[in-house]
Curated annotation (Swiss-Prot):
Belongs to the AccA family. Its EC number is 2.1.3.15. It is found in: Cytoplasm. This is Acetyl-coenzyme A carboxylase carboxyl transferase subunit alpha. The keyword Transferase applies. Component of the acetyl coenzyme A carboxylase (ACC) complex. First, biotin carboxylase catalyzes the carboxylation of biotin on its carrier protein (BCCP) and then the CO(2) group is transferred by the carboxyltransferase to acetyl-CoA to form malonyl-CoA. Acetyl-CoA carboxylase is a heterohexamer composed of biotin carboxyl carrier protein (AccB), biotin carboxylase (AccC) and two subunits each of ACCase subunit alpha (AccA) and ACCase subunit beta (AccD). Pfam families: ACCA. One of its GO terms (biological process) is malonyl-CoA biosynthetic process. It comes from Acidithiobacillus ferrooxidans (strain ATCC 23270 / DSM 14882 / CIP 104768 / NCIMB 8455) (Ferrobacillus ferrooxidans (strain ATCC 23270)). It is an enzyme of class 2 (transferase). Gene3D superfamilies: 2-enoyl-CoA Hydratase, Chain A, domain 1.
Length: 316
């Protein structure tokens, strides 16, 4: 797969282009030149990512080649069955979910799903769920509780869809109900931010016993552009807003909002998805084993205490 380079990666793009040119020449005696350029490109990528800012991290989190929910589901789970619809209005394809097995154990999974091409982006509403998407997730949550199945959620959305129709059909109610149900669901819930975690649209499937986050994911109450538009009346201030919001994985972990940060390959998950899947598989198994060692009462008490801990000054 040919990598799409972000604006701040252009120096790496130029070096990689030179490597490709030399490969295309296919001449003897240039192997050392190719190796030298490859080492230089890697060092340049390391230099860039060693001092990545919050706004640059946002761009990595939004990278169009980044693995999406269905990529994780297909890589981590077996016997995957997709369930559709909220049994009330429609099937919102911005949220997908269903049943599967993880290491042979039946589970319920759900997550936001963005599109790869224009047609799919429109079909999935750019990963912005409507109320029926959250009600589909609610249906799956209740199914999980009924059959005592652990839940895995994958978070990757700019936010809930703010359209008039969505508001008319109860967007805020759908999100609020999911928060209430997930806070008291009598099965283990493991949530993972794999890309963007946009406000209530992310939180609606983000209440659980563990919050994992990929190294170059972001999680915030509002997008940097939205914040900049409100505070400075200028979306061009998004970079400053991103730094101010504290949206990166390490910073959120430091505040006690994220339990574990999953390291990504140099340059982001899209450069080596298999490495990310392998790490996720290992950490999912670890956390699930810990949670399943608790009885239901202990599980719910721990979750309640965890939620009440959020926002307490000095708690982290």
């Amino acid at each position: 797969m040919k990598i799409s380079y972000l604006d701040f990666e252009q120096s790496v793009a130029e070096l990689d282009a030179k490597v490709e040119e030399l490969h295309a020449l296919n001449q003897p005696g240039i192997a050392d030149d190719i190796s030298r350029l490859e080492v230089k490109a890697r060092k340049e990528l390391q230099r860039i990512y060693s001092k990545l800012g919050a706004w640059q991290t946002v761009q990595v989190a939004r990278h169009p080649q980044r693995p999406y929910t269905m990529d994780y589901v297909q890589a981590l789970f077996t016997e995957v069955q997709v369930l559709a619809g909220d049994r009330a209005f429609a099937d919102d394809q911005a949220i997908i979910g269903g049943l599967a097995r993880f290491n042979g154990q039946p589970i319920v999974w759900m997550g936001h799903q963005k599109g790869r091409d224009t047609k799919e982006k429109i079909q999935r509403n750019f990963g912005m769920p409507r109320p029926e998407g959250y009600r589909k997730a609610l249906r799956l949550l209740r199914l999980a509780e009924r059959f005592a199945l652990p839940v895995f959620t994958f978070i990757d959305t700019p936010g809930a869809y703010p359209g008039i129709g969505a508001e008319e059909r109860g967007q805020s109610e759908a999100i609020a109900r999911n928060l209430a149900v997930m806070s008291d669901l009598a099965v283990p819930i493991i949530c993972t931010v794999i890309g963007e975690g946009g406000s209530g649209g992310a939180l609606a499937i983000g209440v659980g016993d563990r919050m994992l986050m990929l190294e170059y994911g972001v999680y915030s109450v509002i997008s940097p552009e939205g914040c900049a538009s409100i505070l400075w009346k200028n979306a061009a201030m998004a970079a400053e807003a991103a730094e101010t919001l504290g949206i990166t994985a390490r910073r959120l972990q430091g505040m006690g909002l994220v339990d574990e940060v999953l390291a990504e390959p140099l340059g982001g998950a899209h450069r080596d998805p298999e490495a990310v899947f392998a790490l996720a598989r290992e950490r999912f198994a670890h956390h699930l084993q810990e949670l399943q060692a608790m009885d239901t009462s202990k599980l719910l008490t721990t979750r309640y205490e965890r939620l009440m801990h959020y926002g307490v000054v000095g708690a982290a």
